[in-house]
Amino acid sequence: MCGTHVDIAAPLVWRCPRATDSDPHHALQLVQGTTPLRATDDANPFVAFQPYLAWDSFGAANGMTEAARTSMIRQLDIDIAGVAGTGFHVTPFDRADSLSEALGFTEDGGVWVKDETDNVAGSHKARHLVTILLHLLTTESLGLAPWTDEADRPALAIASCGNAAFAAATLAAAVKWPLRVFVPPHADPVVIAGLRQLDADIVECPRRDSEPAGDPCIHRFREAVATGAIPFTVQGTENMWCLDGGRTIGWEMARHLEENVVGPPLDRLFVQVGAGTLAASTINGFRMSGVTPRLHAVQTDSCAPLDRAYAKVQGVGGPKAAAAHWSECMWPWEHVGNSAADGILDDETYDWIPVVRAMTEGNGGPIVVTEAQVLEANDLGRATTGINASHTGTAGLAGLLAARDSIDNDERVAVIFSGVSRAALR
């Protein structure tokens, strides 16, 4: 966003080269082509959309054949399935008839639900992380890594106590790569137990009196990266390769609508936002289809830094000027409250700029929901669809509930049930 360009052939570049500890507000963005989106019928989205993925372009730019690149995806998928019980597959995206009826939509309109609960590690998070892993494995296979033996691999690192951590541990275990997970003292015991079963190194991160505002887990994570760990994270500001695989969600949704749904295109897309990576990746995926719905980013009133930033941006010249006014628009939420949708309580929306830009350019906007709406959305979503989604997973639906009175009955809207409920494991 500062104008710095990084060649797609460059290995092991995670952040903008101009980002420093004193000037961290830089973010690399993937440059998408304008070629019409055409996928194969392969069940694995990373094969079906392979030519559009940045990691694939990285391999090609360094002389790796198409067959070798495809083989790498397939072998990695086998390894992942050996740990997770499933590999990557195109996930369901269909009109939820009972939910649509409950919300008063006509037959021409309605709610389409993208169900990520049966994906690798139970959420969308592995989509983002697998393109980081493919970049690493490609770098190794081409002899471009500074290490020559698997035993000398630097540790992967992530700051998370939820689905992202579980996905990271699953993928790391599949390729036997060491992983350090930075978690808060109040981390969910179910998640911690799962991480230990996957041999992750868990680092508890209490707040230190002397440290600046922001998430202590992020501070410890960044310290680890500064000493050689690889950022294996779902924040594009820390590792831009996570934005690559996340686009497959938008590509799948756009392709399904084009090939299987008769009538007008999707009007709106409601996406729950913590770090912002899901929303940024999904809407960028839609852009390549040529049809982009209005984006509504959903946060809870317990923690809504994106909503605040969206309002601030309008006073500094709009999204195009946002990067130059980063500190004026986005800073850590001062008092993070509690919510059943605890997976979107990031005190900063790290990938906020592409989300704000998409909402502004597409005439969408942020929505802040109450805890009552978070709970209602989960009850309604589970009851009408039968999908075992968590409160975080259905938080986008809470945004739809909040905005329902302003939406015409014949509009077509979509939500993403992004993660499975692990409540039964407690």
Predicted regions and their residues:
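Positively charged, low-complexity intrinsically disordered leader regions
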Residues: 56-145
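N-terminal juxtadomain amphipathic helix
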Residues: 1-78
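Active-site/ligand-binding loops adjacent to catalytic centers
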Residues: 199, 207-234, 288-388
